[in-house]
Amino acid sequence: MKNFHVVLEAAWLVRDVKTADDAIGVAISEAGKRLNPKLDFVEVDVGSTSCPACGEPFSSVFIAANTALVGLIFEMKVFDAESAEHAERIAKSVIGKSLRDIPLTVVEVTEFERSGEKGDQQQKGKAKK
C-alpha cells in the first residue's frame, strides 16, 4: 500500500463582493466552515492561474456584477491507497461529502514516504472514515 498527497480544485461562487480579497476571504471561510471540524486535516487555499500573456501566476478570482468565482485548492494526504487512482477516489469522496454540489477536479497526485510522525498516524485514521 502506498501513501499519496492529493490536490483537488473547485470553483466557489461568492455573491455580493466588491474586491478580489473579499471574495477570497469569504470563499475560504465558507469552505472551511463546511469542512471543519470533521476534516481538519484538509488544507484549503486559493488556486493560481497563469497569465496567458506573460505567464506570471495570479490568484484564481474573477469578479463580475459583484459576484466572484474563486478557484480553491483542497489538499489532503491519503494513506494506504492501492494506486494513485484509488487515492483520487478516496480524496474526492472524503472532501465531496462535506462540499455537496461543488464539483471537484483532481489537479495533482504525488506519492510520498510515510514519516512515522504521530500527526500522520492521526490523519490515517481520519482519512479512512
Swiss-Prot record:
Listed Pfam families: DUF555 (PF04475)
Listed InterPro entries: UPF0212
Residue pairs linked by disulfide bridges in the UniProt entry: none
Domain of life: Archaea
Family membership: Belongs to the UPF0212 family.
Name of this protein: UPF0212 protein MA_1372
